[in-house]
Curated annotation (Swiss-Prot):
It is a single-pass membrane protein. Its EC number is 1.-.-.-. It is found in: Membrane. Keywords: Glycoprotein, Heme, Iron, Membrane, Metal-binding, Monooxygenase, Oxidoreductase, Transmembrane, Transmembrane helix. The chain crosses the membrane at residues 17-37. CDD domains: CYP64-like (cd11065). InterPro entries: Cyt_P450, Cyt_P450_CS, Cyt_P450_E_grp-I, Cyt_P450_sf, Cytochrome_P450_fung. The lineage of its organism: Eukaryota, Fungi, Dikarya, Basidiomycota, Agaricomycotina. Glycans are attached at residues 77, 274, 297. This is Cytochrome P450 monooxyhenase eriA. Heme binds at residue 453. Gene3D superfamilies: Cytochrome P450 (1.10.630.10). It holds the Pfam family p450. It catalyses: cyathadiol + reduced [NADPH--hemoprotein reductase] + O2 = cyathatriol + oxidized [NADPH--hemoprotein reductase] + H2O + H(+).
Length: 527
């Protein structure tokens, strides 16, 4: 295979992974190959597919359902681990079992709590403020501490989540429902209202679109979409030079990041100044920090970061999980009926669910766990990174290795969850008399160890109140594909992205009764 063929193969595969500009001409090619041939550690790394010269396992990285393909490889080879070599000497270590993920990401968290560093993201896009992607260290700890202090136990979060769910119910009265757009709006409504006191009116709202654009950019970069992150010397390519188009893209996305971080925060500051700021996490924080000293200004800067990250995070995984809920209910009417019966038994059809019911309807708790288990929003999690060489089970894990926990595989382990792991069955989390059993819940859908998602409580709250509110008042029926035919479960292919979700399908949201309609129409008056 000659040089031109290798470059063609590289470009073909990278373009499938979402690369924006892959021209490697002239000096770009020289830089690339100088870096590729720089070599890496020659040691006994964990098992994996046989690598190619130069490209490593780049062509082995699947573009559809990688979580299933990695799981099959590990099971076929009786291994908890799978190692993929990348060009330039680095590699990806897939952890396919709970034992491997716990051993490394929890028990050895001092080694495996870093995130891979992206030149595109941090240096060129200027998004080092995203604390979920920061290196493990003092800055990350300060941000996480502030997040917990301001978000955990905040009355604003649950109040706005409940109101957003009830606004969704009123939109579902419309016969021309596009549930995916409505779930997008509901999630944005909940998070923007809770963080900034901003209530978006439609899915075309400025802040909703801003979050969508930036989340899309983050997904491309985090998915390894730019050669500059594999070949760092490419950062010196001028913008005007062939192959330098990634810098123009970085400039555009950098502007989105600046806007997302500053505009809504300054909007709340203006509202506070004129006395019109509604209750939100931002208004509560700013009201308590009106001094203008160095310590307060640093806290305000950190707060800008975590507020922006909160609404960016919700624009991704939470939407996908709500779409999975819709799909599961449409495909499993018997499960839907059992969940509705459990809600009816608790509420007697007299009111809508609220957070006083949270934890008091065991079937709904089981349903929530099953939604997160059946298809987690991030099937391969977010990459961790090793901060030094380590040895595990006799294998070298080199410093800088990308660590990918196969969350989907762990939550589909037949030894834990039963042989019917591909079925949607909330009862797997319940005893025969309807109480919680000892099967592990689906908390790992939110991550592992010190890098577990800080917004997981907010995510669970949003999923619970939204799904319970819909089930109390609507039947989800008649799922059909884009050709109008009954939806075939075997044809469903989740997106291969940082926040995975099912393809769109049409379905009907039908009011359960006249009494349910009255609850929907009066819901916001009761909030």
């Amino acid at each position: 295979m000659d040089t031109s063929q290798l470059l063609t193969l590289w470009n073909d595969r990278a373009s499938q992974l979402g690369v924006v500009d892959l021209s490697l001409l002239g000096v770009g090619a020289v830089i690339a190959f100088a870096w590729l041939f720089s070599g890496g550690k020659k040691a006994r790394t964990p098992p994996g597919p046989r690598p190619l010269p130069i490209l490593g396992n780049l062509l082995s990285i699947p573009t559809t359902h990688p979580w299933k393909i990695y799981d099959k490889w590990c099971r076929d080879n009786n291994s908890d681990l799978m190692y993929l070599r990348l060009p330039g000497g680095n590699g990806i270590l897939v952890l396919n079992t709970m034992k491997a993920a716990t051993d490394l990401l929890v028990k050895r968290s001092t080694i495996y709590s870093d995130r891979p560093q992206s030149i595109m993201l941090s240096d060129l896009m200027g998004m080092s403020w995203v604390f979920g992607l920061m290196q493990y260290g003092d800055a990350w700890k300060q941000h996480r501490r502030l997040f917990h202090r301001e978000f955990e136990g905040s009355t604003a979060v649950r109040m706005h989540a409940q109101n957003a769910a009830r606004r969704l119910l009123q939109r579902l009265l419309n016969s021309n429902v596009n549930y995916a757009r409505d779930m997008q709006l509901t999630t944005g409504d909940m998070i923007l209202s809770a963080t900034y006191g901003i209530t978006p009116k439609s899915e075309d709202d400025y802040f909703i679109k801003l979050a969508e654009g930036l989340v899309g950019a983050l997904a491309v970069v985090a998915g390894g979409g730019f050669l500059v992150d594999l070949i760092p010397p490419m950062r010196w390519i001028p913008r005007w030079f062939p192959g330098g188009g990634f810098k123009k893209q970085a400039d555009e996305w950098k502007g989105l990041g600046v806007t997302a971080r500053s505009v809504p925060f300054n909007h709340v500051k203006e509202q506070l100044a004129n006395g019109t700021a509604p209750l939100s996490i931002a208004s509560h924080f700013l009201a308590a920090h009106q001094e203008d000293d160095e310590s307060t200004n640093e806290s305000k800067e950190f707060m800008q970061n975590i507020l922006a990250e909160a609404y960016l995070g919700g624009a991704g995984a939470t939407v996908g999980t709500l779409c999975t809920f819709t799909l599961a209910m449409a495909l499993n009417p018997d499960v839907q009926k059992r969940a509705q019966a459990a809600i009816d038994e608790a509420l007697h059809g007299e009111r809508l669910p609220d957070f006083t019911d949270f934890g008091n309807i065991p079937y709904m708790d089981a349903l929530l766990n099953e939604i997160l288990r059946w298809h987690p929003g991030a099937p391969l999690g977010l990459f961790h990174s090793s901060n030094k060489d380590d040895v595990y089970e006799g294998y070298l894990v080199p410093k800088g290795t990308f660590i990918s926990p196969n969350v989907w595989a762990i939550l589909h382990d037949p030894a834990v969850y039963g042989e019917d792991v591909d079925e949607f069955r909330p009862e797997r989390f319940l005893t025969k008399d309807g109480k919680r059993n000892d099967i592990p819940d689906s908390e790992i859908a939110f991550g592992f160890g010190r890098r577990i998602c800080p917004g997981r409580t907010m995510g669970r709250d949003t999923l619970w109140i939204t799904s319970a509110s819909i089930l109390a008042t609507f039947d989800i029926t008649n799922p059909v594909d884009k050709e109008g035919k009954p939806l075939d479960p075997a044809s469903i292919e989740y997106s291969n992205s940082m926040s995975s979700r099912p393809p769109y399908f049409d379905c009907t949201f039908k009011l359960r009764s006249k009494a349910a309609e009255a609850l929907v129409r009066n819901g916001l008056n009761e909030a």
